[in-house]
Amino acid sequence: MPRSSPRAWIAAAVFLGGCTAQPVIVDRPEGESRARLDESMASNVRSLGANGDWLVIRGYHATDNLVATLTNKPFSHAAVLDLDRDRVIEAESPGVHETPLAKFVAKAHRLMLVRPVWAGKGNAAAALEKARQLVGRPYDFLGLIGLDVPDRYYCSELTLEIYRPFLRPGDLVPRPVDPGQLHYWGRVLYDSGAR
């Protein structure tokens, strides 16, 4: 019986693994159907969401592809909903900033609306106010690898930081937290589903 070489086993594993792996890179579709989808997602967020909720997305940018690959999760970015202003507050490489809701939704391949477990009893209003105060702060590049730099924020760090005063004694929130983990600390109100 002939012996198989290690190369043959590796080639077989790669071939078979490729059959089960989901695509990591997603491209933004164009056209009228995409515009209808964007409007549907935004409408669901407006009707089901509240100030201080989290929007967790799978985006189309190269960094979204990188985050999805490294975390092996279907989500790559997160933001805080400011429903009163029809905006989100998000942390990206330029820093913490506001983005119109429609523009944020347009960069989403998939969108999940999450109500944080700490959002009750007026906490969401205080959390949103904290997020508004953090606009202009720099991005926390080192936080992505677990090295926290005070007064700098990456996307999911921002979403959790604004609720930090309301964490309960038993709430164990690891650092770093990737966007694909946020639903563990909330209730999913809407999920657009994968395309």
Predicted segments — roles?
Residues 19-195:
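Cysteine-nucleophile amide-bond enzymes
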Residues 1-17:
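Sec-dependent bacterial lipoprotein signal peptides
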